[in-house]
UniProtKB/Swiss-Prot annotation:
Residues 122-136 have a biased composition (Low complexity). This is Homeobox protein engrailed-2-B. It holds the Pfam family Homeodomain. One of its GO terms (biological process) is neuron differentiation. InterPro entries: Engrailed_Homeobox_TFs (IPR050720), HD (IPR001356), HD_engrailed (IPR000747), HD_metazoa (IPR020479), Homeobox-engrailed_C-terminal (IPR019549), Homeobox-engrailed_CS (IPR019737), Homeobox_CS (IPR017970), Homeodomain-like_sf (IPR009057). The gene is en2-b. It comes from the Eukaryota. Residues 176-235 bind DNA. GO terms for molecular function: DNA-binding transcription factor activity, RNA polymerase II-specific; RNA polymerase II cis-regulatory region sequence-specific DNA binding. It is found in: Nucleus. Keywords: Developmental protein, DNA-binding, Homeobox, Nucleus. Residues 1-38, 60-138, 156-182 are annotated as: Disordered. Residues 1-12, 102-115 have a biased composition (Basic and acidic residues).
Length: 265
């Protein structure tokens, strides 16, 4: 009987030590709901064409595993409300212990890990910032239309129709007018005698008369036209040819004067 009691006493401390060891293991084990932070990758053409596009993810995953392994001891103190985070400061192997409470643990841990990652973290952040800046610049910059849009006829004022240019009136100066011909007495006497014989000159007769009087053909032609107009205006009678054509109904150039009387009256 005494031996059985001794055996029972020896078993009880062994069970107590086993329970204590199990509790220690449970405290050391990381909680099951802890999940590593996954970063969203922006698949822009600029990011894909960079040489460090595929390598960056592998380095981040490897450093995340190292970071979670070092922080198992710090995460075991979640029940007390105070947590210690071991963060590597540089390549020398020295570490820095930070004591945080409550919900600030995850934010500070992420900031310190990004600082410890050095170029990798900075590069990832810079790539994201570059993409966001490019998108913001694209939205802020106004749309640039091609030049031919502004050169078309109806682009700037579609409701006004085609453009019409009004011709500018040329200011007639006195110098542009043709000076009047000053005929001599002999020239006037010869022109009047020629007009008495024939009121209409042929081309050959006009050329010979211009050579004799030393005038241009146009000057002689204009003098004859003016002479016929003066006679017609003074008499008001139509010539025989006009009367013959009017009788046949082939000629009727009657005009109305300011007084309301026509030439035929």
């Amino acid at each position: 009987m005494e031996e059985n009691e001794q055996n029972n006493r020896e078993v009880e401390p062994q069970q107590e030590s086993g329970e204590e060891s199990n509790r220690g293991i449970l405290h050391q084990a990381p909680p099951g709901n802890h999940q590593p932070h996954h970063r969203i990758t922006n698949f822009f053409i600029d990011n894909i064409l960079r040489p460090e596009f595929g390598r960056r993810k592998e380095r981040i995953n490897h450093q995340d595993e190292l970071f979670t392994g070092r922080d198992t001891g710090a995460l075991s103190g979640a029940e007390s409300g105070h947590h210690r985070v071991n963060v590597p400061e540089g390549a020398g192997g020295s570490s820095k212990v930070i004591t945080v409470t409550g919900e600030k643990k995850s934010d500070l841990a992420m900031e310190e890990t990004l600082k410890s990652r050095g170029l990798n973290g900075d590069h990832s952040l810079s790539s994201d910032s570059d993409s966001s800046q490019a998108s913001s610049k694209a939205t802020q910059k106004p749309i640039l239309w091609p030049a031919w849009v502004y050169c078309t006829r109806y682009s700037d004022r579609p409701s006004s129709g085609p453009r019409s240019r009004k011709p500018k009136k040329k200011s007639v100066s006195k110098e542009d007018k043709r000076p009047r011909t000053a005929f001599t007495a002999e020239q006037l006497q010869r022109l009047k005698a020629e007009f008495q014989t024939n009121r209409y000159l042929t081309e050959q007769r006009r050329q010979s008369l211009a050579q004799e009087l030393g005038l241009n053909e146009s000057q002689i032609k204009i003098w004859f036209q003016n002479k016929r107009a003066k006679i017609k205006k003074s008499t008001g009678n139509k010539n025989s040819l006009a009367l013959h054509l009017m009788a046949q109904g082939l000629y009727n150039h009657a005009t109305t004067s300011k007084d309301g009387k026509s030439d035929s009256e």
